[in-house]
């Protein structure tokens, strides 16, 4: 099974961009991740078993591309996270605060939060994507939740 590249881009562009943004915390780098991921899909010669296989493959490629960017020694001028945040419409102030808290997490925590809660991946699927065992994924999710709980607890209790 091979789906037209334009259709794949239209279907998965937001998801792949979100993976890049979650890991790199920079919209320009996230855009690079998305472009490189879709370019790799376009030139990939083998067929996929299903749409789920395509989705999983794209996520894996995006994660690896983001890791490649993280390994670079130099940084170019980047759009600040604050500037990017100003372009995102949030329904409630708590949504923006939660998003900022997730983005402030170290990437090893933010990526598991993103894949689990925003992409609906299972623990097993996240473990496969990140090349971790399921226990490590559970620990990272637990630690990320605890950090978020501590960060948000004070602010959200003040609003009640």
Enumerate the language-model features and the residues they cover.
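C-terminal flanking helix
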Residues: 17, 38, 106, 110, ...
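DNA-recognition helix of helix-turn-helix
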Residues: 63, 67, 130-154
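A short pre-motif secondary-structure segment
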Residues: 112-116
């Amino acid at each position: 099974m091979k789906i037209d590249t334009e259709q794949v881009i239209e279907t998965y562009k937001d998801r792949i961009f979100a993976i890049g943004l979650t890991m790199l915390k920079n919209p320009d780098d996230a855009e690079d991740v998305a472009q490189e991921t879709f370019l790799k899909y376009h030139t990939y010669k083998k067929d996929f078993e299903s749409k789920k296989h395509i989705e999983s493959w794209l996520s894996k490629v995006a994660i690896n591309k983001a890791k490649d960017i993280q390994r670079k020694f130099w940084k170019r001028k980047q759009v600040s996270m604050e500037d990017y945040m100003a372009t995102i419409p949030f329904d409630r102030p708590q949504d923006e605060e939660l998003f900022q808290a997730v983005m402030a997490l170290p990437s090893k925590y933010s990526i598991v939060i993103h894949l689990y809660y925003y992409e609906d991946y299972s623990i097993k699927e996240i473990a496969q994507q990140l090349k971790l065992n399921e226990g490590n994924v559970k620990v990272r999710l637990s630690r990320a939740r605890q950090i978020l709980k501590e960060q948000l607890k004070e602010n959200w209790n003040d609003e009640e």
